[in-house]
Amino acid sequence: NITDVKQILQFAIDAEIKVFLDGGWGVDALLGYQSRAHNDIDIFVEKKDYQNFIEMMKANDFYEIKMEYTTLNHTVWEDAKNRIVDLHCFEYTGEGEILYEGDCFPIETFSGKGKIEEIEVSCIEPYSQVMFHLGYEFDENDVHDVKLLCETFHIEIPNEYR
């Protein structure tokens, strides 16, 4: 819920770690309100802050859970309240791009600005959010997110979501 997300964001703020929201909460931050229920929070953290973020999670009673998709740069954390953080580690390249899991993305990808109630957050900007929803089998939450992003930010709805 929104209180849990705000608390997790506050942990990062207190630790002076810059985070970028992705996924459903990233969409809702761009919209400025919670548009649906979420089962986790997707967070990107720069490589230089990754270990500190993990230590902060552990200090707040989160533990790592192994999933079939976890890697060195993509870990999942849960606590006793069943709050789940989907944590992604990226780095900036010398060419000013974002490198994540071997793929490069334009620096503007992280230029989104949003809010979770009164907390201002950086997030994936709207067009990139829509593009990242392509090329896989999507569910009703994806349809909800893409349609809201396209309506709100005047982005053409991709064919597979029509």
Predicted regions and their residues:
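Compositionally biased terminal segments of proteins
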Residues: 1-162
